[in-house]
Swiss-Prot record:
Parts of the chain that traverse the membrane: 48-68, 84-104, 122-142, 147-167, 184-204, 219-239, 249-269
Gene Ontology molecular function, alphabetical: unfolded protein binding
A biological process from GO: chitin biosynthetic process
Keywords of this entry: Cell wall biogenesis/degradation, Endoplasmic reticulum, Membrane, Protein transport, Transmembrane, Transmembrane helix, Transport
GO cellular component: endoplasmic reticulum membrane
Bilayer topology annotation: Multi-pass membrane protein
Family from the record: Belongs to the CHS7 family.
Organism, as annotated: Aspergillus fumigatus (strain ATCC MYA-4609 / CBS 101355 / FGSC A1100 / Af293)
Location in or out of the cell: Endoplasmic reticulum membrane
Pfam families recorded: Chs7
Protein name: Chitin synthase export chaperone
Subunit details: Interacts with chs3.
Lineage: Eukaryota, Fungi, Dikarya, Ascomycota, Pezizomycotina
Functional note: Chaperone required for the export of the chitin synthase chs3 from the endoplasmic reticulum.
């Protein structure tokens, strides 16, 4: 396999784009690379569902993403709150798109299928770019939550989405000099650039923890996220067909990759949540007993005035009689 070719990748991993790249079949005339093994379909309520196990994990991922978003939104004054929540919104959109594709809501060989796969690729690139820009927020190079910070991350993510979407669509449709057999640009955008973005983010967070934080526990979150992410990629691209054969086509590497990606995203949240401190003076907590009185006021700071006016409707009021000697009379 030459650089930028998907032949060996698609023979092991049943990726959605594999049916849109590669040489044309001499029999059917359609493009696509058939994997050695892929998960069997399941029938539910007279509906055929592709990749049932992976689709189930996508649904779990949606629920977990909603929980993480709610937790981020509850930290009103946390550093990088608006920036990191953009990352989770993009991940939610990517999960929904992947669920639609993997479950067969938009089946392969259908007209809209190339467009959905192009959107999936675009969201994948946007997600990695958003993660990259989030890596700079902790260094306070610019104030977080401002117009510059929020729209910088939104615009860069949108630009990478458009670039990846267009390259994918041009490749699938043989437009602009690209073709399903000329996939170098697609490979660079999906794998090389995304890998560079993730690597830079990891380096930035390591520098942030080592140079600015006394606590080293966040390194555990980073390490666990990296390990599970790498395991998911290895299981997908290295052992997907082996797993599929050994479990009688009930699972394949896509299931494990989806699950490991979810764990990696959760570690991104845990890392951000751990290193983020909130200004409690201006926050609105969702937990009871957020505030705690540590000690009573000193005795000398308490009011010592005794109120004697029992006829007033305000038990706490006091009337002082003026003692004037004007004109020799007391008033």
């Amino acid at each position: 396999m030459g650089f930028g070719q998907f032949d060996s990748i698609c023979q092991k991993a049943a990726l959605p784009l594999c049916s849109l790249v590669g040489p044309s079949s001499p029999i059917s005339g359609s493009t696509g690379i058939i994997p050695n093994c892929y998960a069997r379909n399941i029938e539910l309520a007279n509906t055929i569902i592709f990749e049932g196990a992976a689709s189930f994990v996508h649904i779990i991922a949606l629920g977990m993403t909603v929980i993480m978003i709610l937790h981020v939104r509850s930290k009103f004054t946390a550093v990088g709150r608006k920036e990191i929540i953009t990352f989770f919104y993009i991940y939610m959109a990517l999960t929904i798109c992947s669920l639609v594709i993997d479950a067969g809501v938009v089946p392969p060989r259908s007209g809209p299928f190339p467009y959905f796969v192009a959107v999936q690729n675009g969201l994948s690139s946007a997600l990695c770019t958003c993660l990259l820009i989030n890596g700079f927020v902790g260094f306070q190079l610019y104030e977080d939550g401002t117009f510059l910070s929020v729209w910088l991350i939104r615009l860069t993510s949108a630009v990478m989405f458009v670039v990846s979407f267009l390259i994918s669509l041009l490749t699938f449709k043989s437009w602009g000099g690209m073709s399903p057999t000329n996939t170098i640009a697609l490979f660079v955008v999906l794998y090389i650039l995304n890998a560079i973005s993730i690597a830079i983010y990891l380096v930035m967070q390591l520098l942030l923890v080592m140079n600015t934080l006394e606590d080293r526990w966040p390194l555990g979150h980073i390490a666990f996220g990296v390990i599970v992410f790498i395991c998911g990629q290895v299981l997908l691209y290295g052992f997907s067909d082996t797993i599929c054969d050994n479990v009688q086509h009930y699972l394949d590497g896509l299931f494990f990759a989806t699950f490991c990606n979810l764990l990696a995203v959760m570690m991104v949240y845990k890392f951000w949540d751990y290193i983020t401190k909130e200004d409690l003076e201006f926050s609105v907590g969702i937990k009871p007993n957020t505030w705690e009185v540590k000690e009573l006021l000193p005795e000398e700071d308490r009011r010592t005035t005794v109120y004697q006016d029992s006829h007033s409707e305000y038990a706490g009021s006091m009337y002082h009689h003026r003692a004037s000697t004007y004109g020799g009379h007391n008033y």
